[in-house]
Amino acid sequence: MKLKSFGVFGNPIKHSKSPLIHNACFLTFQKELRFLGHYHPILLPLESHIKSEFLHLGLSGANVTLPFKERAFQVCDKIKGIALECGAVNTLVLENDELVGYNTDALGFYLSLKQKNYQNALILGAGGSAKALACELKKQGLQVSVLNRSSRGLDFFQRLGCDCFMEPPKSAFDLIINATSASLHNELPLNKEVLKGYFKEGKLAYDLAYGFLTPFLSLAKELKTPFQDGKDMLIYQAALSFEKFSASQIPYSKAFEVMRSVF
């Protein structure tokens, strides 16, 4: 049986559960796929060229995580789907010798929400994940605000029709989303007292980090604010990516079931 290689680019990357859940799917669906896929973590030095690394490693597909999603968007031969709007790519697939970029974070995030009755959202951070979430939430009709420590990247969100801030807005929000890397460093993304104010008024505190009770989620729990980590988003975006890796032979709903069973 033919072997194909896949992976996930990131820095840091050792925390990633993507290899676990993707390899479970490659094992489960090898008969349908007619190849055996192997998916592995790839620690990418910050100065690396993603396309060169992809081709050098002989990959058929890859996911992209922090901090490379915007850079991945720039090196693709083609961009498809909502990735065109959000300027960030988390899924790379070699199609007819061309590197094609997709974004499955956007829909993966929305599918992960248990409820869909939110009117507005505050996104903390302005990186690739934040862009994908903002695109999807705007598409779903929510009012979206973005808070970032600097003006870097905020022009994208302004063009999208989001309200942008470098200082915490004095407003209430249904959804408060941590799309920064603060949780990976065991830190809060924002001043504790300011966050408390948002959580007391909010309907859901959502952290894209997963696998542990982050300081962000711990504070929400302390205040009895409903909270959610990024585990379901990870699985949904991975299942949607796997559908791309399988050239649509395996629908994401089937991949999701397998991934959910192992993580």
Swiss-Prot record:
Disulphide bond pairs: none
Enzyme class label: oxidoreductase
GO BP terms in the entry: amino acid biosynthetic process; aromatic amino acid family biosynthetic process; chorismate biosynthetic process; shikimate metabolic process
SUPFAM superfamilies referenced in this protein's UniProt entry, alphabetically: Aminoacid dehydrogenase-like, N-terminal domain, NAD(P)-binding Rossmann-fold domains
Binding site for NADP(+): 125-129, 181, 208, 230
Catalytic reaction equation(s): shikimate + NADP(+) = 3-dehydroshikimate + NADPH + H(+)
Pfam families: Shikimate_dh_N
Pathways per UniProt: Metabolic intermediate biosynthesis; chorismate biosynthesis; chorismate from D-erythrose 4-phosphate and phosphoenolpyruvate: step 4/7
Oligomer and partners: Homodimer.
Similarity section: Belongs to the shikimate dehydrogenase family.
Protein's UniProt name: Shikimate dehydrogenase (NADP(+))
Species annotation: Helicobacter pylori (strain ATCC 700392 / 26695)
